[in-house]
Each structure stands twice: as C-alpha cells, then as structure tokens.
Swiss-Prot record:
Subunit organization: Monomer.
Name by which UniProt lists this protein: Adenylate kinase
Keyword DNA-binding attributed: no
Phylogenetic placement of the source organism: Bacteria, Pseudomonadati, Pseudomonadota, Gammaproteobacteria, Pseudomonadales
Region span, NMP: 30-59
Domain statement: Consists of three domains, a large central CORE domain and two small peripheral domains, NMPbind and LID, which undergo movements during catalysis. The LID domain closes over the site of phosphoryl transfer upon ATP binding. Assembling and dissambling the active center during each catalytic cycle provides an effective means to prevent ATP hydrolysis.
HAMAP family xref list: Adenylate_kinase_Adk
Main location group: cytoplasm
Annotated AMP binding sites: T31, R36, G57, L58, V59, G85, F86, P87, R88, Q92, R156, R167
Amino acid sequence: MRVILLGAPGAGKGTQAKFITEKFGIPQISTGDMLRAAVKAGTELGLIAKSVMDSGGLVSDDLIINLVKERISQEDCKNGFLFDGFPRTIPQAEALVKAGVELDAVVEIAVEDEEIVQRIAGRRVHEASGRVYHTVYNPPKVEGKDDVTGDDLVQRKDDTEETVRHRLSVYHSQTKPLVDFYQKLSAAQGKPKYSHIPGVGSVEAITAKVLQALS
C-alpha cells in the first residue's frame, strides 16, 4: 500500500498515519526524517543535502525526489510506504510521476479552518512536565493552572491564533492545488485512488473511514 496523506496542520494526520502504518506494516516517510537520515548515513545525496542546508539554502526538488527514490527502494518499503507532508508542491508531485513512483491512494483529511484554529489555539502546556490541556476539550481544574503542580500554563508560540492562521494560509496556497492534481490524475489514470475524509468526529470513526478508503 503506497499512500500519500494530505491535511492541514491540526487535521489529525499524525494520529491516522500511525493507524495506517500499523495496519499495513509500512513505514511513515517524511522528508525531514529522510533528509536527517541521509545526512547521518553520509550517503552521496545526504552529503549534497548537508552542504545546501549548512549554507542556509533550500534543498531542491530534484534532490528530494532522488532521496525519495533511494528511500523507497529500501527493504522496509517492499509492502509500501506512507508519505507524510510530501509532496508539498505541484512540481514535486509532477516529478514523482515522472520518476515512475507509483501510488495506490491519496487520502485528504479535511477539517474546516475555524475548527483547526479552535483545536490548536486552545492548547495550553505545562512546560516542565509536557502536560497538555485544552481550554475547551480538556480544561485544567483551575483555569490557567496545571492540575498537579498549580504552575501557570502557557500557550506555545506555534499555537497562537495568528500563527495557526498563517500556517493554514500557506497550506491552502501550497497544498490545496495538490488535491486538484491528484483528483485529475485519478480521473485520467484510475490511480491513485483519491479519498476526501472529513476529519471531525471520534478518532475511531475517522480511522474506520480512512481504512475503508484504503481497502
């Protein structure tokens, strides 16, 4: 099973990725992990990527695609793989097709922006322990205070409404076109199968829909 999982930050991709990889016995591949592994292993591509990143540059799509091909040729990918956060752009998606990388399914977990803003902007954290609360879904016993220590809870910079809305706008401008790309590819070639799954409701219900889409 060769899957791409799409969805905005906060849509619940990480949770669903875990279920998919366990169910099909496939690795989850993110470009960040892949780059770090290649750099650490000191492969030819890893060394090129390291020199680009060390100089503050962005790793080119060509290099990313070659890393992907190298990664998916490894033994643990023989039953498939799950791409997480890749491809991010149309050129990357087109390059995957050109490189002959076959895909079985593209699953988009769709959640309205306002729901995502509420999910993320409501998070509060106890920094010392890592305990996470939510103002609506999992509030502390005393507002703004950790249940165990009584310390103040904080909102991470990444979780502020302004930051979340910015990340969502980047997602819509970059990744939404991918949805159209894969819908058209699916209509033209019959593959990969494209599924749009509403990411609201219980985790179990969403997982059931995702697994059904992949069956």
